[in-house]
Amino acid sequence: MIQTILAVSIAGIAGTLLRFAAGTWVSANWPRHFYAATLAVNIVGCLIIGVLYGLFLLRPEVPIEIRAGLIVGFVGGLTTFSSFSLDTLRLLESGQVPLALGYAGISVFGGLLATWVGLSLTRL
């Protein structure tokens, strides 16, 4: 368990630093398009998590430290949107279409609402 925690932590640092670097680079080069870095890391993170998940399905012998380190740590540090996308896809693939659509809708609109509420609380 300690090895898994270390793998997630170390890989998480790498993902977080990559996200920070992308944001810094975009801000320096395109300050009016601040959202481009978030969009890019979210899409790239989704691609990476899809590839990793597929590879790990094909190779179940890959140790949990590596799987958790890469998916939860690295991709999770890079973006949490990728985890949401994978969860939604897994629900769809298992035939739980209404649940997947509800989960996606609540995640997107609930997240926007929660962000707005949080911001509003700072303006009281």
From Swiss-Prot:
Belongs to the fluoride channel Fluc/FEX (TC 1.A.43) family. The chain crosses the membrane at residues 5-25, 38-58, 69-89, 99-119. One of its GO terms (molecular function) is metal ion binding. Na(+) is not transported, but it plays an essential structural role and its presence is essential for fluoride channel function. The gene is fluC. Fluoride-specific ion channel. Important for reducing fluoride concentration in the cell, thus reducing its toxicity. It comes from Pseudomonas savastanoi pv. phaseolicola (strain 1448A / Race 6) (Pseudomonas syringae pv. phaseolicola (strain 1448A / Race 6)). One of its GO terms (cellular component) is plasma membrane. This is Fluoride-specific ion channel FluC. It catalyses: fluoride(in) = fluoride(out). It is a multi-pass membrane protein. One of its GO terms (biological process) is cellular detoxification of fluoride. Na(+) binds at residues 76, 79. Keywords: Cell inner membrane, Cell membrane, Ion channel, Ion transport, Membrane, Metal-binding, Sodium, Transmembrane, Transmembrane helix, Transport. It is found in: Cell inner membrane.
